[in-house]
Design a protein with these regions (language model features):
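Intrinsic-disorder/low-complexity detector
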Residues: 22-183
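Sec-dependent bacterial lipoprotein signal peptides
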Residues: 1-22
C-alpha cells in the first residue's frame, strides 16, 4: 500500500471512528492481532469491507496497521458462514436489514428469497402481536364497572372481531413459517 492510499485510508478511518464512538478492537486485540482470524469473525458477522476502517482507527491508537490482505482473505472465509439462506431468513425474521452487496459472490436469488420469507414471518408475527395488544387493552377496559352501556357494547363487538382476526393472523403466520421450511 503506498503512502497516499494509507493516508486516505487513515483519514477515512478517523472520520468514521469519530462518528462511530466506540472501538471495534481493544488495544490488546490490536497488538496481538491475527488479521485473518479477525476477518473470519467479521465476515461471519456480515461486516462490509469498509469495516476494516474501524479496525484501522482503533489500532492507530497503538500504532498498528491492519493487514488488509489477510483480513480480506479471512473475511471471505467468514462470509461463507454468513451468506447462507438460513442466516438470511433469520435476519429477515428478526427484522434486520439485508445488504445484498455483502453477499455479492453468492447465490443472490436464494439469499433474497430466504430473507423475504423471514421478513414475511416477521410482518405476520408483528400483526399477531398488535392484535394481542389490542385484545388485552379491550379486556382491561371491559373490566371497568363504570363503563357506559354503548361503549361496553362497542368494545364487546370489537373484541369479537379481533378474536376472528387473531385466528386468521395465527393461520397466516403458520402458513408463512411452513413456506420457509424448505430453505
Amino acid at each position: 500500500m503506498n503512502s497516499r492510499s494509507l493516508i486516505r485510508l487513515l483519514s477515512m478511518a478517523l472520520a468514521l471512528g469519530a462518528l462511530s464512538g466506540c472501538a471495534s478492537l481493544s488495544k490488546s486485540e490490536c497488538l496481538n492481532a491475527n488479521w485473518e482470524d479477525i476477518g473470519v469473525r467479521d465476515g461471519a458477522n456480515g461486516q462490509p469491507e469498509e469495516y476494516l476502517i474501524q479496525h484501522s482507527t482503533a489500532c492507530a491508537k497503538v500504532n498498528v496497521a491492519p493487514d488488509r490482505g489477510a483480513w480480506l482473505h479471512g473475511r471471505d472465509k467468514g462470509l461463507e458462514r454468513y451468506c447462507l439462506p438460513h442466516r438470511m431468513y433469520n435476519i429477515g425474521e428478526y427484522g434486520g436489514a439485508f445488504d445484498a452487496g455483502i453477499c455479492r459472490n453468492f447465490d443472490q436469488e436464494r439469499l433474497v428469497d430466504a430473507y423475504e420469507k423471514g421478513r414475511d414471518v416477521n410482518r405476520r408475527a408483528n400483526t399477531l402481536s398488535e392484535i394481542d395488544a389490542e385484545l388485552r387493552d379491550i379486556r382491561t377496559k371491559l373490566e371497568n364497572k363504570e363503563l357506559e352501556k354503548k361503549e361496553r357494547e362497542r368494545l364487546a363487538y370489537r373484541l369479537g372481531q379481533l378474536e376472528y382476526e387473531r385466528i386468521d393472523a395465527e393461520r397466516s403466520l403458520e402458513h408463512a413459517r411452513r413456506r420457509a421450511r424448505d430453505l
